[in-house]
Design a protein with these regions (language model features):
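Short hydrophobic/aromatic-enriched beta-strand-loop microsegments
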Residues: 33-37, 86-93
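A short beta-strand-loop structural module common to alpha/beta enzyme folds
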Residues: 35-46
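Structural motif
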Residues: 13, 39, 69-70, 91, ...
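C-terminal binding/interaction regions
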Residues: 5, 11-13, 17-18, 94-151
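Helix-adjacent hinge/juxtasegments
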Residues: 50, 54-90
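Short, solvent-exposed amphipathic alpha-helices that sit
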Residues: 17-29
Length: 151
């Protein structure tokens, strides 16, 4: 991992369909000395509940990030983006992860267990956590995203 960003903490959540990939992500980041807190289910759960848990933690903890996993990542990304201040991105490859950090300052990464293999997920995590926000013209665009949420 090139020059990894060191967030204050990474919050990882998944529903039952993303549990195995979420556990892999947890171990991968712990091996790189990231501070991790997990919200992983012991039974069948509803993904919006876990998206909410992780997003609330990210909003409460400056300089933290979230990772959400479900079967496809779609439901988690939809749920996460309902929160003002959350910029969640469903990433399917390292380029998407790099660009969402560079241009969108994403603070929540969404992954799909049935979509991405372990090798791809490793490259996504490396790109996401080694790319800094470019700022510049992108700051106004992000402000406009938050303005569109009335909550």
């Amino acid at each position: 991992m090139n020059k990894p960003l060191k967030p204050s903490q990474v919050f990882i959540g998944s529903d039952h369909a993303g549990l195995h990939l979420a556990e892999f992500v947890q171990h991968f980041l712990k091996d790189k000395d990231f501070k991790i807190q997990t919200f992983l289910p012991a039974m069948r759960v509803d993904y919006p509940d876990y998206a909410k848990l992780v997003c609330q933690k990210v909003l409460e903890n400056a300089q933290s990030y979230g990772i959400l996993v479900c079967a496809t990542g779609i439901g988690m990304s939809m749920g996460a983006n309902r929160f003002k201040g959350i910029r969640a991105a469903l990433c399917l490859d390292a380029y998407m992860a790099k660009m969402t950090r560079l241009h969108n300052n994403a603070n929540v990464l969404c992954l799909g267990e049935k979509i991405s293999g372990i090798g791809v997920v490793e490259s996504i995590l490396e790109a996401f956590f080694s790319t800094e926000f470019e700022q510049g013209r992108h700051v106004l665009r992000i402000q406009k995203l938050d303005e569109s949420l009335k909550s």
